[in-house]
Design a protein with these regions (language model features):
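Nuclease catalytic cores
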Residues: 34-46
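Conserved catalytic cores of phosphodiester-cleaving nucleases, focusing on short active-site segments
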Residues: 106-108, 114-122, 132
Length: 229
């Protein structure tokens, strides 16, 4: 079982060589760093999930974390409103083919039951929140009882998301956008303190990943996973 200290050590070691690795990579500098930070956040979130379940005394064999596509079927109410008769009839005759596969970064299953979904981002701004909410909304049309989370390394949402207070009041813009997706009830957790700055990226202006905040993330998930132990 990976410990919180080991998560922090991994974060430190990767971020401190990220700039050098990006310059040596055959990939575009910016693209390499975006991918690296995204994968790092997915790793951290995955380990936090495991620690939370372990702390609750859950059997690791009962826990499955994946990102398999969720099949979202076409809505019949939409099909019946299609004005072009031939198009409408064609879709109805082939209705089993009409679906959309969608996923977020972490789908948490306990005993095969889908109970929680977590989107992982190196950072989030409000333009990205709209896409995240749409994804969760579509998933919840099929799996209405899951809990939805956004785990981000840094915040660019304004408000106090990046201040890491015990009670997060959020931002005017983010709450306004989320109010149009009432079925989602998105929980946003930020790991690094300080609003993201485009001119001060964390691979050159290092931000520490603090033990207490990772522990808070663990406790947050424990609160939602406890009923499934």
């Amino acid at each position: 079982m990976t410990s919180i200290n080991e998560i922090i050590q991994t974060y430190d070691s990767i971020l401190k060589v990220a700039d050098k690795d990006a310059k040596e990579s055959k990939r575009a500098y910016g693209g390499f760093l975006r991918s690296l930070k995204g994968k790092l956040q997915e790793y951290i979130t995955g380990e936090i999930i495991k620690i939370a379940w372990h702390n609750l005394g859950g059997d690791e064999k009962r826990l499955d974390v994946n990102s398999k596509k969720i099949r979202v079927p076409i809505r019949l109410s939409y099909v019946h409103k299609i004005r072009e008769t031939k198009v409408r009839e064609y879709i109805l005759q082939n209705i089993e083919k009409y679906h959309y596969g969608i996923s977020v970064d972490k789908h948490i299953h306990i005993d095969g039951k889908f109970v929680m979904a977590i989107e992982c981002k190196a950072f989030t701004e409000n333009a990205m929140i709209k896409r995240i909410l749409v994804d969760f909304h579509l998933i919840k049309t099929v799996c209405p009882n899951i809990s939805c989370f956004l785990f981000q390394l840094e915040s660019q949402l304004t408000g106090d998301y990046s201040a890491l207070p015990k009670t997060v009041f959020g931002s005017v813009s983010t709450h306004s956008i989320m109010s149009y997706f009432e079925d989602v009830d998105l929980h946003i957790f930020t790991l690094l303190e300080g609003e993201r700055s485009i001119t001060k990226p964390i691979h050159t202006f290092f931000k520490p990943l603090k033990y207490d905040n990772v522990e808070r993330a663990v406790k947050l998930l424990e609160g939602y996973l406890n009923e499934f132990v």
